[in-house]
């Protein structure tokens, strides 16, 4: 676990931004930056009014397990979105039992809980969260499941929540585009069976 120093020199916005960006999947950079400046661990970058994000929150919304696990080991807090992304069902249940309204909460950039849970590969967790009220973000949840090859989650979403198969992510790709780019023909065939087309 990182020992945060007593250094009182303020962190710069550039330091924080660089670390948070690294948190979106660049484990090597996260390790190096944190070794050089341990106070970055829970520092939040403000992207805009009301849109703040720490490195672990970045890891959670892109499904970067390695980065999230590393940051947790260094002492970052295990929040609901991260627990859902990692498939830590007992933690998710405990957090929701303590605050039932959190089922409607959103992570960084306003991304809904279901989208984080889709990365877990745990269809039962996704179904339970949806049943409990986490009904926003169905389409992005499918895209996230496809991005990590979480077939069981993709099947559940396709069968139960009618995601928009024409929706495109920030790269302009549909879920089918992502499956094809990954070389996941089984997933691509599943999506085509539900009417998906490439963009």
Report residues per predicted region.
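Ankyrin repeat A-helix N-terminal signature
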Residues: 20-26, 54-64, 82-88, 116-122, ...
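Ankyrin-repeat-protein effector appendages
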Residues: 2-20, 69-82, 98, 131-132, ...
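N-terminal segments that cap or nucleate solenoid repeat domains
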Residues: 5-48, 87-105
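Ankyrin-repeat boundary/"N-cap" motif
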Residues: 9-21, 42-58, 77-84, 105-116, ...
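Ligand-binding grooves and catalytic loops that recognize ribose/phosphate and carbohydrate rings
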Residues: 107, 112-113, 119-128, 132
């Amino acid at each position: 676990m990182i020992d945060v120093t007593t250094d009182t020199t303020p962190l710069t916005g550039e330091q924080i931004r660089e670390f948070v960006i690294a948190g979106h999947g660049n484990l090597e950079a996260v390790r190096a930056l944190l070794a050089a400046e341990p106070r970055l661990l829970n520092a939040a970058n403000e992207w805009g009014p009301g849109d703040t994000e720490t490195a672990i929150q970045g890891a959670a919304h892109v499904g970067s397990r390695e980065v999230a696990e590393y940051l947790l080991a260094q002492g970052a807090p295990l929040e609901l979105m991260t627990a859902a992304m990692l498939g830590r069902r007992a933690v998710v249940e405990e957090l929701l039992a303590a605050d039932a309204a959190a089922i409607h909460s959103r992570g960084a950039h306003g991304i809904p809980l279901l989208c984080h849970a889709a990365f877990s590969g745990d269809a039962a967790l996704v179904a339970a969260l949806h049943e409990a009220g986490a009904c926003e973000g169905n389409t992005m949840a499918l895209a996230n499941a496809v991005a990590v090859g979480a077939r069981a989650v993709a099947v559940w979403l396709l069968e139960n929540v009618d995601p928009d198969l024409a929706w495109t992510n920030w790269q302009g790709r549909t879920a089918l585009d992502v499956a094809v780019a990954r070389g996941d023909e089984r997933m691509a065939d599943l999506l085509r069976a539900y009417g998906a087309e490439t963009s």
